[in-house]
Amino acid sequence: MRIILLGAPGAGKGTQANFIMDKYGIPQISTGDMLRAAIKAGTELGKQAKAVIDAGQLVSDEIILGLIKERIAQDDCEKGFLLDGFPRTIPQADGLKEMGVDVDYVIEFDVADDVIVERMAGRRAHLPSGRTYHVVYNPPKVEGKDDVTGEDLVVRDDDKEETVRARLGVYHEQTAPLINYYGKEAEAGNTKYLKFDGTKQVAEVSADIEKALA
């Protein structure tokens, strides 16, 4: 099961990604994690990426696609994988297709901008693990503390309103066109496109996903 998640920052992708990973036993492939791992391991692509980053440039699609190709060839991706944060642009989606990566499902989480801004303000993060909570929608068992370690949760700079609105602007400009792109791919029978109402409760959205993927 090869899945791409689409949705604005704060639409609930991360929470549902964890659900899908646990439920179906497939790894989440995050381009950020992949880049860090390749740089740390000193692979050929990692060295190229490091040189670009050190020069203050953005890593090219070519390098990212190369990393994805290496990553999905690993044993844990045998049953499939979940792509989160990639593709972000039409050229990246084309690159994935040209590489021969078939996508079984494209899942979109639909949430209005104002709802996202309100949501982000309530987010709390456990930085060492990357686990995230929300004071209203997905509270920790103990207020302000991580469920697993009991350590303090923090509000990330990313979750402040002006930052959120700026990121939403970028999303609408760059990534929203992928909704049309994958809609057409689905019409052509190349993938299945699933759209979920991201304003519903976390458990409800998870149940909807499970039903759709059954």
From Swiss-Prot:
The keyword Transcription does not apply. One of its GO terms (biological process) is AMP salvage. Residues 30-59 are annotated as: NMP. Its EC number is 2.7.4.3. It holds the Pfam family ADK_lid. One of its GO terms (cellular component) is cytoplasm. Catalyzes the reversible transfer of the terminal phosphate group between ATP and AMP. Plays an important role in cellular energy homeostasis and in adenine nucleotide metabolism. HAMAP family: Adenylate_kinase_Adk (MF_00235). This is Adenylate kinase.
